[in-house]
């Protein structure tokens, strides 16, 4: 991984790695980069009947650090966006188990992926 990769490209690569990781671990990716006027969800996936909004955080170093950038305000927004996604897809939030996870992807010294299940 070169050091001149743009922040956008790094984020896109991190999301690709996160999707692959989730798929290998039994998740079905339902949507990526879902956007509405209020914001964006990186990944929406399903496993064992649970709909999961996954926030992907990428960085060059230390897989624990990027996760620290998810604030209480961001968690509230992710919850709102997940409910908006459910509404758009005609799914009833009261009949489905929901969860918010985070996946941290770092590249230096080597690729490291950490999945934080149920951050909210």
From Swiss-Prot:
Instruction: Extract the GO molecular function terms from the UniProt entry.
Output: nucleic acid binding
Source organism's superkingdom? Bacteria
Q: Which InterPro entries match?
A: Restrct_endonuc-II-like, tRNA_endonuc-like_dom_sf, UPF0102_YraN-like
Fetch the Pfam families from UniProt. UPF0102
The family this protein is said to belong to: Belongs to the UPF0102 family.
Under what name is this protein listed? UPF0102 protein TW312
The protein's organism comes out as Tropheryma whipplei (strain TW08/27)
